[in-house]
A protein has these predicted regions:
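Non-catalytic, usually N-terminal nucleic-acid engagement modules in DNA/RNA processing proteins
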Residues: 1-64
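Catalytic cores of enzyme domains
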Residues: 31-32, 39-42, 51-188
Length: 188
């Protein structure tokens, strides 16, 4: 499992968290939760594949070659959708906010979970849980105005979080992902 960490980092996945793979597959106890911050965006722009679902295909093109034959990848954009948020909380990657966004202790809400890789092996030792998100007044106000079907209110919720503001996605990345939401597609 640990042999994959440098390759995933080199591919642009700057969030990789070990977890107990039994959460997805009892026969594959070693797991890696794979995510990224805005650092992956320039790589996507340089490689942007033509055709439908370019970001999802880009993610797969980076991860698939790194996965051993005896491992399984559960992508966040493919059905059945894996419980990536639950895995993030259980593994100690972040805490769940009242909005159901996972809040990373450094990046805040400005990261994305892409895949869970499970393989034979020993699970990692239990990780300490991240302290629960404590919404201050800006977060409470944004939460009170949150409309589940309005992408602008979701963006306002992320912007209200004081954690990780310096890791906010660039405007073109926000536009790309929230344009998908406006069209009714899953956002990655």
């Amino acid at each position: 499992m640990h042999h994959m960490l440098p390759a995933l980092a080199a591919a642009g996945f700057d969030i990789v968290q070990p977890f107990d793979g039994a959460l997805l597959d009892p026969s594959r106890r070693a797991g890696l939760l794979v995510g990224n911050t805005r650092a992956l965006w320039p790589r996507f722009l340089a490689a942007r594949p033509p055709g439908p679902d370019p970001f999802d295909r880009f993610i797969e093109s980076l991860i698939d070659p790194l996965v051993p034959a005896d491992a399984r990848v559960h992508y966040g954009h493919r059905q059945p959708f894996p419980p990536l948020q639950s895995i993030a909380v259980e593994s100690g990657l972040g805490s769940l906010s009242p909005t159901r966004l996972v809040i990373h202790p450094v990046y805040g809400p400005w990261f994305a979970l892409r895949a869970a890789i499970v393989m034979p092996g020993e699970p990692p030792p239990p990780a300490p849980r991240v302290t629960s998100c404590t919404c201050g007044e800006p977060c409470r106000s944004a939460l009170a105005n949150l409309k589940m079907d309005d992408w602008r209110s979701w963006l306002a919720m992320r912007d209200a979080c004081p954690i990780g503001r310096e890791y906010r996605y660039p405007d073109d990345q926000i536009e790309f992902h929230y344009a998908l939401l406006r069209m009714g597609a899953p956002v990655g």
